Amino acid sequence: MSSRREIRWGNARIYASQNNTIITITDITGAEIISKASGGMVVKADREKPSPYAAMLAANKAANDAFDKGISAIHIKVRAQGGYGSKTPGPGAQPAIRALARAGFIIGRIEDVTPLPHDTIRRPGGRRGRRV
């Protein structure tokens, strides 16, 4: 008999904003969350939440939980804030992807799923802006 292990696929969703990085690993359908971690869960100070180091630690934490539950391969979906917010992922996106790759996962595809408006979107605050 061959000693090949069974490959179980999952989705890793990385939401990287300017304020935090959230990593969620789900099964392939997306119906069940297998593990979840964020930059705020692994560092003490609030100012360190968006840092690349916090994203790396959060990705390692989520990866270890997913490995324990049997996930061995992932598709990565990266998302920025989108809409009227930033359309480029925050500083934690790249280190999170790198940490998931180094954790030993087989990586299928990496895609950007940031919601982009096709015309424009009205910013909050109304016509005269936010009055402070």
From Swiss-Prot:
Gene Ontology molecular functions: rRNA binding; structural constituent of ribosome
A GO biological process held by the record: translation
InterPro entries reported for this sequence: Ribosomal_uS11, Ribosomal_uS11_archaeal, Ribosomal_uS11_CS, Ribosomal_uS11_sf
Gene3D superfamilies xref list: Ribosomal protein S11
Gene Ontology CC terms, in alphabetical order: ribonucleoprotein complex; ribosome
Pfam families in the record: Ribosomal_S11
Keywords recorded for this protein, A-Z: Ribonucleoprotein, Ribosomal protein, RNA-binding, rRNA-binding
Superkingdom of the organism of origin: Archaea
Family, per entry: Belongs to the universal ribosomal protein uS11 family.
Description of how the protein assembles with itself and partners: Part of the 30S ribosomal subunit.
Known function: Located on the platform of the 30S subunit.
Stored HAMAP family: Ribosomal_uS11 (MF_01310)
Protein name: Small ribosomal subunit protein uS11
